[in-house]
Amino acid sequence: MVLKYFLETFKSRKATLNPIMSNSTPTARIKIGYDLAEVCRAAAGEIQRMADRSATPAKPLTFALSGGSTPRSLHAILAGDPAVRDRLPWHRLHFFWGDERHVPSDDPQSNYRMAYETLLSLAPVPTQNIHRVPAEEPDAALAAEKYEQELQAFFKLEAGQPPRFDCILLGMGPDGHTASLFPGTEALHETKRLVVANWVEKFKTYRITLTVPVLNHADLIVFLVSGAEKAEALKEVLQGDYRPDRFPAQLIRPDNGKLLWIVDKAAARYLTHSIII
């Protein structure tokens, strides 16, 4: 699949249109902000617009949250800025996770704990709208199976059918991983499961992660990438040869949705204005 990218910059910076391969190719956008704060402000705006566009007031809006440090600033805006917080229909927002560490929910490394402390406990989110990974299970494979069952029940899925999230938030590491899809790991090649326990050798642990088919079935995928340490990987993911075993973020190519990269200047330092993958 060929993706065509529209490169945008924020505020007074001039937008640049990138080459278009054909009218039928799926379109992704890249927004480049000055710093992490600007990146997260833009992401909050995307979430707000998505909620505003929702045509069915009673329909749940489903999000998959990401881990890492980058989302903290986004959470602070969503939960702490009245201009954003007071406009979001929190009673309709359902929160899931793109991946989780195999630790109890109160562990400092828990993605759930980070999201709860920085967002979910500070916003009027009904308890029943929080769908965390049962990562306290001693057996990581069982935790993945239980979370898959949670998705199947909530989204009322038929066998083999992936859920359609309204929005999946993703990050990217300096090694090009996203969610817990790490270079060279088995989960990169999973096509039938919704959730798997993925052994990550460099950490000597399992990570529980949504699979590529689930991520690519979302209505909107938003990558948030910040920091100079990710610049080389970002260039490879967006402009390098297609090597998803080495740079797993290249696997994220929505089958019938939108893809948006919001990155800061430090992360975008090696990108050119001609981005076609």
Provide a role label for each language-model segment:
Residues D52-A83:
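Glycine-rich N-terminal segment of FAD-binding domains in flavoprotein oxidoreductases
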Residues L3-L7:
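Short hydrophobic targeting helices and cationic amphipathic motifs
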Residues S22-T27, R87-D166:
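Ligand-binding beta-strand-loop-alpha-helix segment within the catalytic cores
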Residues P213, D219-I277:
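ATP/nucleoside-binding phosphotransfer catalytic cores, i.e., glycine-rich phosphate-binding loops
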Residues I20-F63, A141:
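N-terminal glycine-/serine-/threonine-rich phosphate-binding loop
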Residues C167-P213:
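Class I SAM-dependent methyltransferase SAM-binding "motif I" and its flanking Rossmann-like core
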Residues A76-L88, R113, E117, P183-K192, ...:
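A glycine- and small-aliphatic-rich helix-loop capping segment at beta-alpha/alpha-beta transitions
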Residues L65-T70, L170-P174, S226:
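Glycine-rich beta-strand-to-loop/alpha-helix junction loops that act as flexible
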